[in-house]
């Protein structure tokens, strides 16, 4: 299959894609090869936290590319040392391992927990994760995930994962046994439809894991780097995990992820973990640029304010069209449509030049750039409102 200028069939057909081919991006907008402009409220699934091709990242990449691409992970390099120090200084953790993707960071978290169990808990290896959770597409992270669609795939799965119910502390407690080493979850389950763990539940979970000597692992791949109005979501809750993973926004569009751990949990020994591009100077230069921007005065305050504005506007849409309300935090929000019409709305919005996401058939997810403007929010809301009005009229006629 081809467009006028681009063949498709050399790429593995792993997902349904619209036929547009994007060639340029700036801020909250993308342009395809026919010069059509799109307002992007997906941003690579919360990857482009500063929008498309921001000068801060582009300049950092260009400067680093002229200095050093990679010396091998067998040697230290300046950007990785600086980024690790900055992450430690701005978090509850003591050490960092850099990875190429969120799935790789989560795989590392699973390995680290098992290593901890081997050293300190008599070989305990089981990890309690959650129904509806999503931790990646490696075999182990798919096994840790609670995504129904994964269940029949690539059997046999990796053993050692038990699933509890989100926001149900009793369901966690009853799964704990002598083989349990950790509890792993996303503070907000993105792929299942933006379902937040309550602050109270996370506090109860922290108390429970401490009481049983278990590690608490937070997957902040989608919620981290300012997405919810704090640098890391756990800061909203008054607790701190033992292990945290980052991805998506930490690279601002460049493949970068991180595994962070407290001194107590950071028990890897030489040879336990590694990778050819881990801590690559180019990737870490992008991470430093992102952290510098997100750390500027009032940046996170602006994310909170903009998130409240987007939530308010979506609530108005929900009320006007008799929908199921809004959930989420900051600039990671979902609109409950109450009907399985989300894919159709996404398709119509695409034709109208607005990119939206449907993690479930009855849910729209919103993940704009953290510096999205009020005017851009208004533009998206106008488009969504028009589509829902048309859909409502069609249902009434039917």
Swiss-Prot record:
Taxonomic source organism: Bradyrhizobium diazoefficiens (strain JCM 10833 / BCRC 13528 / IAM 13628 / NBRC 14792 / USDA 110)
For the ligand (N(2)-acetyl-L-ornithine), the binding residues are 137
Enzyme class at the top of the EC tree: transferase
* Enzyme nomenclature, EC number: 2.6.1.11
Name the encoding gene, please: argD2
NCBIfam families associated with the record: argD, PRK01278.1, PRK03715.1
List S-S links within the chain.
none
Q: Which GO terms describe its biological process?
A: L-arginine biosynthetic process
Q: Which cellular component appears as one GO term in the record?
A: cytoplasm
A molecular function annotated in GO for this UniProt entry is: identical protein binding
| Record keywords | Amino-acid biosynthesis, Aminotransferase, Arginine biosynthesis, Cytoplasm, Pyridoxal phosphate, Transferase
What does the sequence similarity comment in the record state about its family?
Belongs to the class-III pyridoxal-phosphate-dependent aminotransferase family. ArgD subfamily.
Q: What else is known?
A: May also have succinyldiaminopimelate aminotransferase activity, thus carrying out the corresponding step in lysine biosynthesis.
Query: In terms of domain of life, where is this protein from?
Result: Bacteria
The record's cofactor note says: Binds 1 pyridoxal phosphate per subunit.
Residues that span the membrane, as ranges: none
Give me the residues that bind pyridoxal 5'-phosphate, please.
102-103, 134, 219-222, 276
> What is its quaternary makeup?
Homodimer.
Any idea what this protein is called? Acetylornithine aminotransferase 2
Keyword Mitochondrion in annotation: no
Record's catalysed reaction(s): N(2)-acetyl-L-ornithine + 2-oxoglutarate = N-acetyl-L-glutamate 5-semialdehyde + L-glutamate
